[in-house]
Amino acid sequence: MEGAMAVRVTAAHTAEAQAEAGREAGEGAVAAVAAALAPSGFLGLPAPFSEEDEDDVHRCGRCQAEFTALEDFVQHKIQKACQRAPPEALPATPATTALLGQEVVPAAPGPEEPITVAHIVVEAASLAADISHASDLVGGGHIKEVIVAAEAELGDGEMAEAPGSPRQQGLGLAGEGEQAQVKLLVNKDGRYVCALCHKTFKTGSILKAHMVTHSSRKDHECKLCGASFRTKGSLIRHHRRHTDERPYKCSKCGKSFRESGALTRHLKSLTPCTEKIRFSVSKDVVVSKEDARAGSGAGAAGLGTATSSVTGEPIETSPVIHLVTDAKGTVIHEVHVQMQELSLGMKALAPEPPVSQELPCSSEGSRENLLHQAMQNSGIVLERAAGEEGALEPAPAAGSSPQPLAVAAPQLPVLEVQPLETQVASEASAVPRTHPCPQCSETFPTAATLEAHKRGHTGPRPFACAQCGKAFPKAYLLKKHQEVHVRERRFRCGDCGKLYKTIAHVRGHRRVHSDERPYPCPKCGKRYKTKNAQQVHFRTHLEEKPHVCQFCSRGFREKGSLVRHVRHHTGEKPFKCYKCGRGFAEHGTLNRHLRTKGGCLLEVEELLVSEDSPAAATTVLTEDPHTVLVEFSSVVADTQEYIIEATADDAETSEATEIIEGTQTEVDSHIMKVVQQIVHQASAGHQIIVQNVTMDEETALGPEAAAADTITIATPESLTEQVAMTLASAISEGTVLAARAGTSGTEQATVTMVSSEDIEILEHAGELVIASPEGQLEVQTVIV
């Protein structure tokens, strides 16, 4: 139907006004009657005609002429050549007499579901006038003036609205015995359009049920709390809040919901389940058909047994049936049923769905209706799959009918039905991608897809990020980009426990735990676990380097490489060490700075001694040699004492040692702080000796304690080697100890770079000497 057919429903508040309107119309007063009031209900007007109804019989409501072609029927109505047929018998009820004021002909119901609205009287005069006017506007559409009697009656204490009020014009509800004014629109596709929210519906009955949502009447009252609702379904959903019933359960994470819509939002939300359950189910269901019909817990004598074992990947749909019980009501297994439509040859083999004792059924048809109703209530999407004849075999039953009731075979996981997206993705991955994008280096299988992709680079970008200003051509790309600004890592890997910002990152990371490499290189055939790794590798086969530096004209294949290169020109160092404040141009350099064995040494904390802090360390260099004891209770269980000794003459004539840090990592211990402080305040010519404290202090210090150029660190025997190695680490890996002034009695002029290998040699040699290039400072560590 080309135009739009508008059905305008006008209201009259009395039967006299209705009769007067009919008399003014003359011979064209009544064109058709769509419904007649009956004690048991209402007759209805057939749904609007569409292309699928061309083979149906179309009957004129005025002359009762029948047409098989829709075009002939419409032409017949426009010509106004038909005459009203002789009146037939109408149910003689006071309502019909008062409403119509004359005899009318009831219209036969159409092939579709009738519109269950009240009396509809078609006014031919208004029809002819509106048709001539609407043909110029909507191109041959039809506008009908119909009168709809209000079905709803006002309750006690409610007052009827005045004629023409917004409620009567928009909602179609009026007081008792009155009629409502509603504007019903039928578009060119034959679908009913709601005049308030512009939603479309297939039949008028669905539109009528939808119109209830725009009404203020709430006839369904909760008996527990007194809350009222417009529809019965809303009352049922509300009642679950009192009972805490959660019939809709997620098959991935096990979380239950009260409404099917909540489950659907859970599956489509930004925080869906991260883990898919790999299951291997073996369940025994013991139910007899007789007990299922009667709903009684009979003995096990006449029970049938069925066993079903399935193994495979779960299909991502919502469950229909959750629990399978035996004859005594004991839960045997929780079942997640995947409904699939079988071929005609397999319907005889498919067992019946399980039936709980709480819902006894009297026939096979009622059980199917219950299952179908449960699917509708739970929002199940029925996937159609063509099964093989040998894929399902009936399980043997003992002592009962050959078709056991509760075999959970509707899952059919062995078929492994893939969603359409997965099939398309698998087919697309098999096609070689030989058309790379010159701007982003992404590859495409055809030139057409490449051109469509290029429009994303050159076309308009109306969707901009509010935080960084980056624009995108589509909204979903902006939504995906906004995940970058989220700092919270809410998604955890079930295998290793790592946290990620998005679920897509978790899915990509999970391939690390498997040997699957689904992304092959179209050039060399090398396979990769992630698409990004495959794309990065593919760029190595390309000679193009589209990302050019603006300072030196050097080209790069990846944009990230260009960004890192530009930092060398600008001097930008965005990655700061949280301890020493040193900046780095690349994140990897910062990680290496934090991972090296020496620790971050640029920030040397001054160790102060106070009465309240017995664990603080200090280095005292005074005029007279002395000894300072420092406790470190956090290093080991026992208390260790560090004896530090030096002279004042050397301290007055020397300057502080400068430590040029190479690549050291953090060693968070008191030993490291003391050693750093010693090295920092040691002057030229000092010797640092590590000794055991196995006897009294005088014996432990030995002859080195009397030397004027010696700093002796006396430790317990268990920590001697540890302190010596820590001291060596403090001045190793590229570190140079240098003094700007001072004299030295040493004649050595060699530099020994300490590394892990040198420390191993130190354990065997017993002594290691490290001297500055000019021989200004000597550090000697002795392991006794």
Swiss-Prot record:
GO cellular component, one term: spindle
Listed name of the protein: Transcription factor E4F1
Reactions listed under catalytic activity: S-ubiquitinyl-[E2 ubiquitin-conjugating enzyme]-L-cysteine + [acceptor protein]-L-lysine = [E2 ubiquitin-conjugating enzyme]-L-cysteine + N(6)-ubiquitinyl-[acceptor protein]-L-lysine
Main location: nucleus
Species assigned in the record: Homo sapiens (Human)
Keyword Ribonucleoprotein listed: no
Keyword entries, A-Z: Cell cycle, Cell division, Cytoplasm, DNA-binding, Growth regulation, Host-virus interaction, Metal-binding, Mitosis, Nucleus, Phosphoprotein, Repeat, Repressor, Transcription, Transcription regulation, Transferase, Ubl conjugation, Ubl conjugation pathway, Zinc, Zinc-finger
Region annotation (Mediates interaction with CDKN2A) ranges: 369-566
Tissues where this protein is expressed: Ubiquitously expressed.
Region feature (Mediates interaction with RASSF1): 575-597
UniProt GO BP: cell division; DNA replication; negative regulation of transcription by RNA polymerase II; positive regulation of transcription by RNA polymerase II; protein ubiquitination; regulation of cell cycle; regulation of cell cycle process; regulation of mitotic cell cycle, embryonic
Induction / repression: Up-regulated by estrogen.
Region (Mediates dimerization, DNA-binding, transcription repression of CCNA2 and interaction with HMGA2): 184-263
Record's subcellular location: Nucleus, Nucleoplasm; Cytoplasm
Stretches the record annotates as Mediates interaction with TP53: 521-580
